[in-house]
C-alpha cells in the first residue's frame, strides 16, 4: 500500500485567466496550466474548468485526492454555489460548481474566497511564521 502524500488539484479563477496547478506535500508537482477564462456562460466556464483539471490529471497520472480552488465572491463557499460575479457575466448566481466537479472527478471539491485563501497561505507559508519566530526570540508572548 502506498503512503504517498495526497495530490490536490487547484485553480485560481480570475476574470482573465484560469490558472491550474497540482500540489503534493506543499509543492507544485507538474507544469501549471493557464487557460483563458470563459466567462460568457456557465457551460463555457464549466467546460474550461473541466478541461484544465483534466489536463493536470492526465499529466500527473496519479490518483487525485481533492480539488481546491479560489473563486471571487459572492458565493456560498460551504456548498460550492457561485453567485453573481462582476468578472463572470455568464454566471447569474446559483451556479453549483462544487457539485458539478465532484460528479465529474469523483473526489471532494473545496471552494473558498481568493482573498481568504491568499491570507491563509501567507499565514502558513509566507512571512507570518518568520514574524512569529522573531517575536518568540524577543520574548514576546504574542503569536499570530
Predicted regions and their residues:
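Short glycine-aspartate micro-motif
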Residues: 8-12, 64-68, 110, 136-137, ...
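Alpha-helical structural signal in soluble globular domains
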Residues: 23, 55, 100-104
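Short glycine-rich anion-binding loops that position phosphate/pyrophosphate groups of nucleotides
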Residues: 16, 72-75
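Short glycine-rich, Thr/Ser-proximal phosphate-binding strand/loop in the N-terminal lobe
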Residues: 2-47, 51, 58, 82-84
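Glycine-rich phosphate-binding loop and adjoining helix at the ATP-binding site
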Residues: 43, 76-143
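Phosphate/pyrophosphate-binding loops at sites that engage ATP/ADP/AMP, CoA/4′-phosphopantetheine
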Residues: 49-67, 108-109
Amino acid at each position: 500500500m502506498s503512503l504517498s502524500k495526497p495530490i490536490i488539484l487547484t485553480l485560481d479563477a480570475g476574470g482573465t485567466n484560469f490558472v491550474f496547478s497540482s500540489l503534493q506535500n506543499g509543492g507544485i508537482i507538474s507544469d501549471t496550466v493557464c487557460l483563458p477564462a470563459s466567462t460568457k456562460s456557465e457551460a463555457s466556464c464549466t467546460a474550461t474548468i473541466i478541461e484544465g483539471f483534466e489536463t493536470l490529471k492526465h499529466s500527473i497520472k496519479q490518483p487525485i485526492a481533492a480539488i481546491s480552488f479560489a473563486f471571487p465572491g459572492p458565493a456560498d463557499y460551504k456548498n460550492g454555489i457561485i453567485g453573481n460575479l462582476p468578472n463572470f457575466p455568464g454566471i447569474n448566481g446559483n451556479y453549483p460548481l462544487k457539485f458539478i466537479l465532484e460528479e465529474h472527478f469523483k473526489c471532494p471539491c473545496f471552494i473558498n474566497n481568493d482573498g481568504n485563501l491568499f491570507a491563509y497561505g501567507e499565514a502558513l507559508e509566507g512571512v507570518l511564521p518568520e514574524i512569529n519566530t522573531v517575536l518568540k526570540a524577543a520574548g514576546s508572548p504574542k503569536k499570530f
